[in-house]
Amino acid sequence: MQRRIFLKNGTLAIAGLVLTRQLSAMTAAEPQTYYFKDDGNIPNSQFPLLVYKNVFSHRGQKGGDWLEQRFAENGWTNTWRWGVYPFHHYHSTSHEVLGCFSGEAVLQLGGESGKKMKVQAGDIIVIPAGVGHKCITHSSDFTVLGAYPFDLSPDLMKGEKGERPAADSRIAKLKLPDTDPLTGTMSGLTKIWKK
């Protein structure tokens, strides 16, 4: 009987420690910020793109499930699982979050003159409406979970002639999210994205 109680209490203590470490890592996570200027084709944004590096440990299906639950808890829904388009594009009807739960890739962020960045499982990227993104190269297992605030659906803009100024107008009218997809109301975009 004593051994059973000891094992039960020990298991609960370990589970509590793991959960505490995961939560403290998420709340302590400070995103990297990247600003991109309008390049004439891709509008980009006054708000920075946010990159959380290696902020969750789940991989594969469990990682996708964890991200979907975490994002939904923080009001980011309408999810999908796939890769990133191999051409420059942006969204004018919603902000977007991408959580990588499998593989790795090199993305170009901010349009033709933007930044090339390696992303891998464990990384989360919060993309303001208007910011260009494209996949340059990826591993065969590269997969992200995408989601949007307010259950919005994104359009697909490619920086082509005739998209603007209508796309700029839609972006300007978008409400800022109430929560960060990873940290909720504690930090992240709620502290960084200010009008």
Please place each PLM-identified region on the residue numbering.
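Short, conserved beta-strand element in jelly-roll/cupin
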Residues: 93-106
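Double-stranded beta-helix
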Residues: 136-195
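N-terminal twin-arginine translocation
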Residues: 1-5, 15-29
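Conserved short histidine dyad/triad with adjacent acidic residue
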Residues: 72-91
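Non-heme Fe(II)/2-oxoglutarate
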Residues: 30-56, 60
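Conserved metal-binding segment of the jelly-roll/cupin
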Residues: 119-138
